[in-house]
């Protein structure tokens, strides 16, 4: 049981790290000396030095991506907190439904954010020299891991 709890906590922390990195790092779209993320656009030289960064445009779709990524982090943190609370207060044989629901919501939020970004980002559709960066890919990797973690929480029963 201890090994199972430890592996679930490691999976949950891995999801949290993926969510934080994908939200913070400026690598959602890269190409031609530019790097774009949810918060700013940066241009770099061939040596890798950052020359100029400016805030991303205030598009409604970008604000919805920002909001859903932040919500996914909040839901995942709440889920981890609720897991520890339920671990000590839940009766024997009880299931971690609330924890699982919050983690599944975190997964759905990150999936929504990545899907909206995929469909709506204008530079990607206009220029084939751009490609998705690693932070964008980490967001997509966090989606199935968060769903898996949430399903494990829902199935998990508390033992002594």
Curated annotation (Swiss-Prot):
Per the UniProt topology annotation, the Cytoplasmic ranges are: 1, 92-95, 157-160
GO biological process terms on file? apoptotic process; bleb assembly; cell differentiation; chemical synaptic transmission; myelin assembly; negative regulation of cell population proliferation; negative regulation of neuron projection development; peripheral nervous system development
Q: What is this protein called?
A: Peripheral myelin protein 22
Xref: Pfam families: PMP22_Claudin
- The entry's keywords: Cell membrane, Charcot-Marie-Tooth disease, Deafness, Dejerine-Sottas syndrome, Disease variant, Glycoprotein, Membrane, Neurodegeneration, Neuropathy, Transmembrane, Transmembrane helix, Ubl conjugation
Described by its record, this protein's role is as follows: Might be involved in growth regulation, and in myelinization in the peripheral nervous system.
UniProt PTM comment:
Ubiquitinated by the DCX(DCAF13) E3 ubiquitin ligase complex, leading to its degradation.
The residue ranges for the Extracellular side of the membrane come to: 32-64, 120-133
Q: Which gene encodes it?
A: PMP22
Q: Which family does it belong to?
A: Belongs to the PMP-22/EMP/MP20 family.
List the source organism: Homo sapiens (Human)
**Could you tell me which InterPro entries the record lists for this protein?**
PMP-22/EMP/MP20-like, PMP22, PMP22/EMP/MP20/Claudin, PMP22_EMP_MP20
**Glycosylation sites noted in the Swiss-Prot or TrEMBL record:** 41
Any one cellular component term from GO for this entry? synapse
Query: How does the record classify its membrane topology?
Result: Multi-pass membrane protein
């Amino acid at each position: 049981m201890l090994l199972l709890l430890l592996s679930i906590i490691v999976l949950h922390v891995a999801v949290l790290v993926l969510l934080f990195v994908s939200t913070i790092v400026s690598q959602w779209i890269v190409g031609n000396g530019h790097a774009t993320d949810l918060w700013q656009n940066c241009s770099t030289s061939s040596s890798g030095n950052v020359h100029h960064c400016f805030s991303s445009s205030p598009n409604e779709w970008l604000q919805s991506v920002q909001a859903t990524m932040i919500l996914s982090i909040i839901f995942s943190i709440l889920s981890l907190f609720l897991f520890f609370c339920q671990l000590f207060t839940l009766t024997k044989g009880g299931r971690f439904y609330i924890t699982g629901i919050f983690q599944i919501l975190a997964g759905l939020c990150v999936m929504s954010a990545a899907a909206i970004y995929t469909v709506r980002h204008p530079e990607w559709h206009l220029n084939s020299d751009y490609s998705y960066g690693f932070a964008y890919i980490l967001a997509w990797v966090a989606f199935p891991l968060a769903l898996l973690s949430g399903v494990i929480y829902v199935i998990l029963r508390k033992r002594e």
